[in-house]
Amino acid sequence: MSGILTRWRQLGRRYFWPHLLLGMVAASFGLPALSNAAEPNTPAKATASNHDQSVKVNFSQLALLEASNRRPNFTVDYWHQHAIRTVIRHLSFAMAPQTLPVVEESSPLQAHHIALLNTLSAMLTQEGTPPTIVRRVARAHFTPQASFSVPAWISQAQGIRAGPQRLS
């Protein structure tokens, strides 16, 4: 009897909980966060008509769609973040190389795994902040030269001096 319970616990630890967390994280991406004030249930017909209205978008309104706030009630959910961090931790342990990679034997797949591990560790260590819209961008002031010269252009473009500065 204890052997069956041990096997069941191992199955849950290895397969059930990581896949359940991965499913929770995958299902929650792209869904709007639920606000504290729940809206009353609407009939199916009204929901379908609202959905159809949101699909009909003119091309002239694309800028308005881009400027609109995609997640107006953005809230940071502690348990959602915990599930994401746990899945990232599971993935990073599962993808970690078992031996130290040798420089001569590195393949593109190993490089891809290392890059993915670096990205996952960066996601774990940096603090998550909601996206913000940048309203004003500082523009660089461009001052054109008074006259065009080939040596000056080559020196600026390629970082070398091509010929004398002045032709006498």
Swiss-Prot record:
InterPro entries linked to this entry: SecM
Keywords: Cytoplasm, Periplasm, Signal
Major localization listed first in the record, in broad terms: cytoplasm
Signal peptide start and end residues: 1-37
GO molecular function terms listed in the Swiss-Prot or TrEMBL record: translation regulator activity
Pfam families: SecM
Keyword rRNA-binding: no
Subcellular location: Cytoplasm, Cytosol; Periplasm
GO cellular component: a single term: cytosol
Annotated function: Regulates secA expression by translational coupling of the secM secA operon. Translational pausing at a specific Pro residue 5 residues before the end of the protein may allow disruption of a mRNA repressor helix that normally suppresses secA translation initiation.
Record-stated family: Belongs to the SecM family.
Protein's recorded name: Secretion monitor
Organism: Citrobacter koseri (strain ATCC BAA-895 / CDC 4225-83 / SGSC4696)
Upper classification of the organism: Bacteria, Pseudomonadati, Pseudomonadota, Gammaproteobacteria, Enterobacterales
